[in-house]
């Protein structure tokens, strides 16, 4: 009898979860305040990582930027400092013009910290994390964004590039999380964001290593989320970001069927990051951009494999990576010729 009652209770909770999820489509939850919180972003030197840094800077977060390229990382930091200076100038002007009863945001001593770190190397992650704890303090939000792509067919891809892709895109999530999660669990306070890809939910030809790494991120993130729930650490939030192809140059040359592309073009980086920020700031567990990706994921889960192949061929998604791979191969050959190899 006890299990029957529990079954009805679980059914009610499942239905209630659907109601709450549906309500969020009509009433957007209020964004949480990250002002003064330490937010660490990997791969901050370019692409989405840089845009994430600028968005968090506008929300007055203290930023810790990691990248393997110190020059590009400093360029991002300079952009962040410009935003901080603008915010402080606005605060000063508002404070000068405000009445005694008017509430004005406190002028925080906003700072940005840069660290050169190869997240594909475990020792580099752990040693840099120790420096962050010592020089900055405890990290509230960890945004795992760093990623690479080899751009080779499987049988033409050197083993070292396969290993590098797995290390940077997937294994780094384990190492950064192990470095910063203990303090979050101690405080029951924090947020872990995993930037994966739609190619971590469904795959295509020619990017076996990249797909495997992103599928790994999705599996890692989901298991971590369940582990935090099992440990009753409800104060630690997790968000999985799975965007469609983003126009950052990482997959330059990738093309689906030309008749379909106007309806499903590559995402603008700004749009992708703004959608992800909405999810992060409202503690949304997962976001796929565009929303059409949810439908594709559902169809992939229920349709026979041959039906999925037919859909891929119709959309031109079965060989969409081939032009990209050809461009990468041509660029490699040109560099070798230029260097006399």
UniProtKB/Swiss-Prot annotation:
InterPro entries: NAD(P)-bd_dom_sf (IPR036291), Sc_DH/Rdtase_CS (IPR020904), SDR_fam (IPR002347). It catalyses: all-trans-retinol + NADP(+) = all-trans-retinal + NADPH + H(+). Coiled coil: none annotated. The active site is at residue 210. Pathway: Cofactor metabolism; retinol metabolism. It is a single-pass membrane protein. PROSITE patterns: ADH_SHORT. Keywords: Endoplasmic reticulum, Membrane, Microsome, NADP, Oxidoreductase, Signal-anchor, Transmembrane, Transmembrane helix. Its EC number is 1.1.1.300. CDD domains: 17beta-HSDXI-like_SDR_c. Substrate binds at residue 197. It is found in: Microsome membrane; Endoplasmic reticulum membrane. Gene3D superfamilies: NAD(P)-binding Rossmann-like Domain. Its main location: membrane. It is an enzyme of class 1 (oxidoreductase). The chain crosses the membrane at residues 3-23. One of its GO terms (cellular component) is lipid droplet. One of its GO terms (molecular function) is oxidoreductase activity, acting on the CH-OH group of donors, NAD or NADP as acceptor. NADP(+) binds at residues 40-64. Retinol dehydrogenase with a clear preference for NADP. Converts all-trans-retinol to all-trans-retinal. Has no detectable activity towards 11-cis-retinol, 9-cis-retinol and 13-cis-retinol. PANTHER family: PKSB (PTHR24322), RETINOL DEHYDROGENASE 10 (PTHR24322:SF750). Belongs to the short-chain dehydrogenases/reductases (SDR) family. This is Retinol dehydrogenase 10-B.
